[in-house]
């Protein structure tokens, strides 16, 4: 919606560097300090988003908010987080399932018409663990996790 454009863009920008790109900064860090900086920023922003979603359904808008591009941009990263990023990219301070509001957000997104059908969890996991041989030398694809959004 045009009246929310600035708020939507600001939310997308706030999430991109520390969350959407932050998981990759963590996973492909070449130094301990680069990793520490990326993980710290990532979880600081996840903590902020958890607080923001208290009593709300969506990231932007009045009251409970309304579904916008900001939600759609954040969803893939959160949906893949416990399945891939916690282990593969060492983003393991907490899982999304440990954040009740973020977990509920992911579940709400998955329950939207047409979303669940596009989430091919095994493919997502296989792609990440197979394609980044430099950080997963033997291309082992883990069996877990056994709980989370991917089990819905």
Language-model-detected regions and their locations in the chain:
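C-terminal alpha-helical interaction module
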Residues: 1-152
């Amino acid at each position: 919606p045009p009246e929310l454009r600035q708020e939507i863009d600001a939310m997308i920008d706030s999430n991109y560097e520390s969350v959407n790109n932050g998981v990759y900064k963590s996973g492909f860090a070449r130094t301990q300090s680069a990793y520490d900086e990326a993980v710290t920023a990532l979880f600081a922003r996840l903590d902020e988003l958890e607080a923001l979603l208290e009593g709300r359904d969506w990231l932007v808008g009045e009251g409970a908010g309304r579904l916008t591009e900001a939600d759609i941009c954040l969803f893939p990263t959160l949906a893949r987080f416990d399945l891939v990023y916690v282990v593969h990219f060492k983003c393991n301070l907490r899982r999304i399932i440990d954040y009740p509001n973020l977990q509920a957000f992911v579940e709400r997104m998955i329950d939207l018409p047409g979303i669940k059908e596009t989430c091919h969890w095994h493919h997502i996991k296989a792609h990440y663990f197979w394609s980044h041989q430099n950080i997963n030398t033997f291309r082992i694809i883990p069996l877990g996790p056994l709980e989370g959004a991917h089990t819905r």
